[in-house]
Amino acid sequence: MATQLPSPTATTSHSGNEPRRVIRESCNNCSAQKIRCGKQRPACARCVNKKLQCNYSYSQRSGRRSSSMNTQRGGPHIAFLPGIPDTPATMPDANAMSAMYGSLTTSSPGLQGTTLSPSIETSLEYDQNPFEDPNQYHDLTFDFLASPPNTEPLHSRSTSSNTGTDMGDTAMVDSEAFWHSFPSMPPQNLDALRSVSNHPIFDQDQVASFRRSLEKTVQHGHDCMALALQVVNDLSVTREPCLVATSNPMTGIETHQMQARDVDTVLFINRDAAQSVKKILDCSCSSDQAVSLACYLATSKIVDWYGAAIEAVGERTEDFSKNAGPKTSQGIMAERIIARPIYMGKYCLDPEVQRVVRAQVVLGELKEHVQPLLNSLPRFHITGLEAESDSSANGQQACILRNQLRNVIQSARDLNGTGSS
């Protein structure tokens, strides 16, 4: 049984602001099955063949889309100008534009007393998107720019295209007063923010600079020799006195300041250096004796820093400096290390106990990171007539790095009280 409904163009009666309701072209059955309807009236061919009840409902797409800006257009204060679509059918008339501009002049003290002529009202230019200009908002906590924007007032832009307009009765807008009406943050507050954001972190900055130096060397190309020499350079400490360093006093002071590290920083830097040397030894470049020699130097510096971490003390008195003997490589490095106190909860350990803890940590680092390097490093032997004349030098050349490592391990075990190995 078919239901007689009006034609698709028929609309229901409406009064006032009630939207017009249009009958949909497809019947309910065809729309539910997503099938193209024959659109016959009063019943489509498909419903007649299948003996279905054919009904045509009202379209859900009818009516005008409600706009939030339409409700704000008649408000007393408007913070910014709404975006205007490109279609000429939706452009507001001159009276609406004049009302909107009047609300702006009443809310801004710099625009009070300004009038608009009819020719100006029809030539006003609006930005396509008001959110692109942050200076239009009145609730900003600081200015995005350091000086007023290099733009003309709204009325001057409109009058530039109309040269025949008489501006004698129109008051000029004070751009300075309009700009200063926005709130701004004092310069001292901005300086405080910059000082907080640029505050360096001591430990992380040193480790990060060391890693950047290694990454910079690798980015230049596959050069294991350059990477090994970079590790040696980063781990080296200038001996005092050094003729090259003392020739420029400022260079010596700067080097001394840059090489001050704490024990944790030494451990992190040594780990990165050991990983870099391990990569070089795994590469085919390690077959070159010059590259292997550079790896020996880098490993020797790593062992020296571990030994210096054991010798580091919290505070050095004047008597300690006077009674100290000739400075060794580890002794010079130990002076560059800051031994921070170690806490267990709220209890600070004694200085001797702190050295024992650091020695135990160093033993673990040596076993985990340095021992694999020694197993991978090739052994050098003296060849030729020199080897035949002096056989003792041959054995000394092969064991110099291992002897250095044994001394560090022995120092750590002495602090732990385990005695000799």
Curated annotation (Swiss-Prot):
- Its chief place of residence is nucleus
Output one GO BP term: aflatoxin biosynthetic process
Name the segments for region: Disordered: 1-20
Q: Out of the domains of life, which is the source?
A: Eukaryota
**Which residues form the DNA-binding region?**
27-54
Xref: Gene3D superfamilies = Zn(2)-C6 fungal-type DNA-binding domain
UniProt source species: Phaeosphaeria nodorum (strain SN15 / ATCC MYA-4574 / FGSC 10173) (Glume blotch fungus)
Q: Where is the composition biased (Polar residues)?
A: 1-16
Its keywords, alphabetically, are: DNA-binding, Metal-binding, Nucleus, Transcription, Transcription regulation, Zinc
Q: What's the protein here called?
A: Elsinochrome C biosynthesis regulatory protein elcR
This entry carries the following GO cellular component terms, namely: nucleus
> Which function does this protein serve?
Transcription regulator of the gene cluster that mediates the biosynthesis of elsinochrome C, a perelyenequinone phytotoxin structurally similar to cercosporin.
Q: Which GO terms describe its molecular function?
A: DNA binding; DNA-binding transcription factor activity, RNA polymerase II-specific; zinc ion binding
List where in the cell it is found.
Nucleus
The record's PROSITE patterns line, in alphabetical order, gives: ZN2_CY6_FUNGAL_1 (PS00463), ZN2_CY6_FUNGAL_2 (PS50048)
Per the UniProt record, one Pfam family is Zn_clus
Q: Where are the disulfide bridges?
A: none
